[in-house]
């Protein structure tokens, strides 16, 4: 009964924290992917000069910025005068958006790095594993899309 608002508040704050951590990790993955594309050579030239890969990295950047923006909005809503339902909707939207960004940015980073991305020597694989775990924490993006729709 009376504890429910406190539990909802704690859950929403936890979801924002998990989402923010994921956004930070995604931005590192993007940065490392761009750096790698400048040094990895194929056909005698850096793969970062290939327009198709530039487009993919631009899409990764867009996904990171979308996720960052909505997480900031959700964090701001937690300290606002919005109703509990509005706060929960903002948080669910953020977790949903971050879940989609995790899939998009994570998979692109792994593909651009190639097989080396999943070795223990390269930290992109570690980041990918971490963001995958963060996506599943407190319900994945699909769950929060349904949660948002139900509110």
Predicted regions: what they are:
Residues 1-5:
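Long, acidic (Asp/Glu-rich), low-complexity accessory segments flanking structured domains
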Residues 9-151:
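Alpha-helical interface subdomain recognition
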């Amino acid at each position: 009964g009376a504890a429910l608002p406190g539990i909802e508040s704690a859950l929403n704050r936890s979801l924002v924290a998990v989402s923010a951590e994921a956004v930070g990790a995604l931005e590192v993955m993007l940065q490392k992917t761009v750096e790698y594309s400048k040094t990895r050579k194929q056909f005698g030239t850096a793969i970062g000069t290939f327009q198709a890969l530039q487009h993919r990295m631009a899409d990764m950047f867009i996904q990171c910025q979308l996720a960052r923006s909505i997480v900031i909005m959700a964090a701001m809503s937690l300290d606002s005068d919005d109703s509990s339902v509005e706060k929960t909707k903002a948080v669910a939207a953020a977790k949903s958006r971050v879940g989609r960004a995790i899939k998009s940015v994570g998979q692109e980073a792994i593909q651009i790095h190639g097989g080396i991305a999943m070795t223990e020597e390269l930290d992109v694989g570690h980041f990918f594993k971490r963001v995958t775990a963060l996506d599943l924490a407190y319900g994945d993006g699909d769950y929060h899309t349904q949660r948002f729709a139900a509110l």
